[in-house]
């Protein structure tokens, strides 16, 4: 999940990627508003969903934890994972890794929202002029490009969040944790694996972020003007429900990719690593079966409430302060 990549909207000198983008009036002001509103909405929603997010990650990566001797037996489900985590580590441990997640998510989501509309202006398709499908495709492309543009610079924070969330007290080693905090994750990973350790799984993440964000933003902005008409335009629950359904669909479509990248993250610092994302995918399928690629998907559906809240909450804030009804990102 990257973010600043030389982006010039128009805060820095233009990069070639944005050279042909249509100019925008009051660009700095709109960019700042997008960044702030998207980031605040994201930070609040992720903190609220942190317990279910940690459970999702624990279930998703439990096979790597068992291999490393950091989990004695598999989780039987969401309830079992919640219960065992609270019993072994305390209630507050459900928020382990949330600080890194908020640090990562604030600029990631804020810039996703801001860049989505900027990329949409680059494609500049109009539904009435260019036709629905060209306009729809432009929305998908702008959503995917926004997500891809926010991948590189904060990827290491996502790695650190994943390692902290999956840092259950070791089943072999007197209940000791592997990491003492965010800085310790960086220190130990750099010592054992170098910079590459912080970016393990990055390539497959690029694919996943385009698939997920393309659907997440593109479908929402494309379907919202069609489905949320009349009084439904300002109905929080209608906007929330649409966002929840779209977040679930996008999440399930890209979930196997997410599993592979996180399983690769978990091998940094370990003696045995996957050779590539394809090797990881093949090994997981061969040794554990296809169902292993979807472990934690149930918790991910619950977690999607946070994603839906970001989208609908952002829209409602825009309506309240700016009288804007459409465009979950800026213009």
From Swiss-Prot:
A motif (Nucleotide carrier signature motif) lies at residues 261-266. Keywords: Antiport, Membrane, Mitochondrion, Mitochondrion inner membrane, Repeat, Transit peptide, Transmembrane, Transmembrane helix, Transport. The chain crosses the membrane at residues 31-58, 99-123, 132-152, 202-223, 237-257, 297-317. Pfam families: Mito_carr. Disulfide bonds: none annotated. It is found in: Mitochondrion inner membrane. Gene3D superfamilies: Mitochondrial carrier domain (1.50.40.10). It is a multi-pass membrane protein. The matrix-open state (m-state) is inhibited by the membrane-permeable bongkrekic acid (BKA). The cytoplasmic-open state (c-state) is inhibited by the membrane-impermeable toxic inhibitor carboxyatractyloside (CATR). One of its GO terms (molecular function) is ATP:ADP antiporter activity. This is ADP,ATP carrier protein 1, mitochondrial. The gene is ANT-G1.
């Amino acid at each position: 999940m990257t973010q600043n990549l030389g982006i010039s909207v128009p805060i820095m000198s233009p990069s070639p990627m944005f050279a042909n983008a249509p100019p925008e009036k009051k660009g700095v002001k709109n960019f700042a508003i997008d960044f702030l509103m998207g980031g605040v909405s994201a930070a609040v929603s992720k903190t609220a969903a942190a317990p279910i997010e940690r459970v999702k990650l624990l279930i998703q990566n439990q096979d790597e934890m068992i291999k490393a001797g950091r989990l004695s037996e598999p989780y039987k489900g969401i309830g079992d994972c919640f219960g065992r985590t609270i019993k072994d580590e305390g209630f507050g441990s459900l928020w382990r890794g949330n600080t890194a997640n908020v640090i990562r998510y604030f600029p990631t989501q804020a810039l996703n929202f801001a860049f989505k509309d900027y990329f949409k202006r680059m494609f500049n398709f109009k539904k009435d002029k260019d036709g629905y499908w060209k306009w729809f495709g432009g929305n998908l492309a702008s959503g995917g490009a926004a997500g891809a543009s926010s991948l590189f610079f904060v990827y290491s924070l996502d790695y650190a969040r994943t390692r902290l969330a999956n840092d259950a007290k070791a089943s072999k080693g007197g209940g000791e944790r592997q990491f003492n905090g965010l800085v310790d994750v960086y220190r130990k990973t750099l010592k054992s694996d170098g910079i590459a350790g912080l970016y393990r799984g990055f390539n497959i993440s690029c694919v996943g972020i385009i698939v997920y964000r393309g659907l997440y933003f593109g479908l929402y902005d494309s379907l919202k003007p069609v489905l949320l008409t009349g009084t439904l335009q300002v109905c929080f629950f209608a906007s929330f429900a649409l966002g929840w359904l779209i977040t679930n669909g996008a999440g399930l479509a890209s979930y196997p990719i997410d599993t592979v990248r996180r399983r690769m993250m978990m091998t940094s610092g370990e003696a045995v690593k996957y050779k590539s994302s394809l090797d990881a995918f093949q090994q997981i399928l061969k040794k554990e079966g296809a169902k292993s690629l979807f472990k934690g998907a149930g918790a991910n559906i619950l977690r999607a409430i946070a994603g839906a809240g970001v989208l609908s909450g952002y829209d409602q804030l825009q309506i309240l302060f700016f009288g804007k009804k459409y465009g979950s990102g800026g213009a």
